[in-house]
């Protein structure tokens, strides 16, 4: 889901 992608970006 989009939430997962956003989570990865925040992890960077």
Curated annotation (Swiss-Prot):
One function term, GO molecular function aspect:
toxin activity
Q: Which family does it belong to?
A: Belongs to the MCD family. Protonectin subfamily.
- Tissues and organs where the protein is expressed, per its UniProt entry: Expressed by the venom gland.
Motif (Dimerization motif 1) positions are 3-7
* Cysteine pairings via disulfide bonds: none
What's the protein here called? Answer: Protonectin
- Which residues in this protein are found as Leucine amide? 6, 12
Q: Where does the motif Dimerization motif 2 lie?
A: 7-11
Major location category of this protein: secreted
- Entry keyword annotation includes Secreted: yes
Localization recorded for this chain is: Secreted; Target cell membrane
Q: GO CC terms for this protein?
A: extracellular region; membrane; other organism cell membrane
- Miscellaneous remark of the record: Two derivatives of protonectin with substitutions of all the amino acid residues (D-prt) or the Lys residue (D-Lys-prt) with the corresponding D-amino acids have been synthesized. Both derivatives D-prt and D-Lys-prt exhibit strong antimicrobial activity against bacteria and fungi, and both of them could disrupt the integrity of membrane and lead the cell death. D-prt has similar hemolytic activity than protonectin, while D-Lys-prt has significantly lower activity. The primary structure of this peptide is identical to that of protonectins from Protonectarina sylveirae (AC P0C1R1).
Q: Which key words are in the record?
A: Amidation, Antibiotic, Antimicrobial, Chemotaxis, Fungicide, G-protein coupled receptor impairing toxin, Immunity, Innate immunity, Mast cell degranulation, Membrane, Repeat, Secreted, Target cell membrane, Target membrane, Toxin
What Gene Ontology biological process does one annotation of this record name? killing of cells of another organism
